[in-house]
């Protein structure tokens, strides 16, 4: 059942399942909380209270909110972090945040800003540090070239076709409900204002998150898909994130053959990694 949390200037949509220590699931750009349709029930069955939330401007969450930066045309890592912390306070933290892509970076910021509320973070294929074009990778690695080209096209031409061509690359193998899920996502992005909200995430700057990595004090698990088209070398990206954290804080795991959406493509493997981590670090 969808619930709504009133936050500064709008509402965040979320649903809760299960009982136990609190786990917050936060999806990536251009998606909605149903991205965790496979992972959330597995975590609930393992004994956790799981809240899946829509990013601001996405899914059923409200549109048109002012960024914490003061801009009205941006959805940034700090914005998402603020919403996640508001949800944790509302539900009664502390919580472990599981953040995908942009939400991985947001989880980092939330953990630094409120260490009393965030007991640990799991970052799935995260954008948590400054990105730059890997020219050699662009020339040599087809998945990286195809993924990046479509993302550039999306920002330049603002047409959803580029996004769905990117998603085709980002899921190297498709879940059984892929076509139905993409149809539902396309319908959501056709709603008035939704595509414009999605494009606001292009104003986010992972570099502002990367500068906070040395301040992380809670355990962190970084999970990378080896075929993620967003990175020329996904394992190296994960290693670099952990290297920027204090020694002993972070751990990297990889999902062989996984794309950018490992939680939907390989939910059993991701669930095993996350549940093992939660058993050590989640607390009521």
List the predicted regions and their residue ranges.
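Flexible "cap/lid" loop of the alpha/beta hydrolase fold
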Residues: 112, 120-152
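Active-site loop/oxyanion-hole signature of alpha/beta-hydrolase fold enzymes
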Residues: 45, 55-98, 102, 272
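Short glycine-enriched nucleophile-adjacent loop
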Residues: 104-115, 121
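Conserved HGGG/HGGXW glycine-rich cap/lid loop of the alpha/beta-hydrolase fold
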Residues: 15-64
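Catalytic active-site module of serine/aspartate enzymes centered on a nucleophile-bearing elbow/loop
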Residues: 246-284
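Conserved alpha/beta-hydrolase catalytic His-Asp/Glu region
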Residues: 132-133, 154-215
